Amino acid sequence: MIIKILGEGCSKCDEQLKNVKIAIEELGIEADIQKVEDFREIVVYGVMSTPALVVDEVVKSSGRVLSVKEVKKYL
C-alpha cells in the first residue's frame, strides 16, 4: 500500500501525516508513506485544498485533517 499526504508543508499536513502513522501502527499494516509537497505533483491529483490523503493513487480526502479513526476507514 502506498499512502501519500499531499500538502505544501503546512502544520495541518504534518498533523495528517502523524495521524496516518498512528493508524498504520494501530492496524498493524505495512505501507509506504510519502509526503508530497511539490505543487505541480499535487495538481495532477486534482486536489485544490490540502492536506489530502491518497491511498494507492486514489484521492480519499482533501481540505481537512482526518482523525486517526477516519484514516483507518480509508486503509
Language-model regions, residue ranges each:
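Compositionally biased, disordered extreme N-termini, encompassing classical targeting presequences
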Residues: 1-4, 28-30, 73
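Structural micro-motif
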Residues: 46-54
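Short, flexible helix/strand-to-coil boundary loops that buttress conserved ligand/catalytic motifs
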Residues: 17, 46, 75
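Conserved hydrophobic residues forming the short capping helix/wall of the S-adenosyl-L-methionine
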Residues: 20, 24
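Local sequence-structure signature of Cys/Sec-based thiol-disulfide redox active-site neighborhoods
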Residues: 1-19
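Non-catalytic, surface beta->alpha helical segment in thiol-disulfide oxidoreductase systems
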Residues: 55-75
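Thiol-based oxidoreductase modules, predominantly thioredoxin-like and allied folds used
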Residues: 29-39
